[in-house]
Amino acid sequence: MKTFLILALLAIVATTATTAVRVPVPQPQPQNPSQPQPQGQVPLVQQQQFPGQQQQFPPQQPYPQPQPFPSQQPYLQLQPFPQPQPFPPQLPYPQPPPFSPQQPYPQPQPQYPQPQQPISQQQAQQQQQQQQQQQQQQQQQQILQQILQQQLIPCRDVVLQQHNIAHARSQVLQQSTYQPLQQLCCQQLWQIPEQSRCQAIHNVVHAIILHQQQRQQQPSSQVSLQQPQQQYPSGQGFFQPSQQNPQAQGSVQPQQLPQFEEIRNLALQTLPRMCNVYIPPYCSTTIAPFGIFGTN
């Protein structure tokens, strides 16, 4: 009986040995010891082995050691800045050479007068035209002077009549005498060019001022407005300027300015409206020299 049991055990051991050799044992994977191994992964053969006959597992290979990190290269050393080179010593400024004594200026040589070149024909014609224009202007001025000397006396008497009426003086012309004066004055103003009417008005004003000066210097003489038919056709004036008055023909004196402005305003109000003529506006602000208005 015992032998039978021994034989049976040997047969079982032999069969288990053959199966153990044929079946590869799986290599155990390294696991964290803290985690439990699953129960279903152990082969059935190992569970049938008897104690004392368990096969030893091959030794586990050690984990590869991590390669050490390469040692860090040391940082490059900063190169020091180059030291500035010292400036070279400045050279002294060159001394200016001493001034040489000034040479005397050359004496200017006397220049002989150059002979005048003959005037060209074109320049001669231009000079001749200028002379002709000047002669024409002088002739026009002479004609205007004659008109002012002989023909503006009626305008003087008309303005003087208005001046006497304004100041309530006794020397007032009658209506039969005043109307012909108006007609003669307007006829003469119409003949005077527009650019010369301002001068004509100023001459009328100056004639009135001279007339009043003569009356003040000769109170006993008979200086009065006479009949137009006796004086105007011959172009004679009503008064003779006193030879003792050097200012009879000249510019307006400072003491005469108020009187001049008063009579001028009266003339500018009377003559343009009476004769229907245009008088430039600047006549009320300018003062023209007189002396053109002559009396005989």
UniProtKB/Swiss-Prot annotation:
Protein name as annotated: Alpha/beta-gliadin clone PW1215
Miscellaneous comment text of the record: The alpha/beta-gliadins can be divided into 5 homology classes. Sequence divergence between the classes is due to single base substitutions and to duplications or deletions within or near direct repeats. There are more than a 100 copies of the gene for alpha/beta-gliadin per haploid genome.
Record-stated family: Belongs to the gliadin/glutenin family.
Posttranslational mods: Substrate of transglutaminase.
Protein function: Gliadin is the major seed storage protein in wheat.
SUPFAM superfamilies: Bifunctional inhibitor/lipid-transfer protein/seed storage 2S albumin (SSF47699)
Biased composition (Low complexity): 37-58, 117-126, 220-241
Organism: Triticum aestivum (Wheat)
Stretch forming the signal peptide: 1-20
Stretches for region Disordered: 24-126, 220-255
InterPro entries reported for this sequence: Bifun_inhib/LTP/seed_sf, Bifunc_inhib/LTP/seed_store, Glia_glutenin
Stretches with biased composition (Pro residues): 25-36, 59-71, 81-116
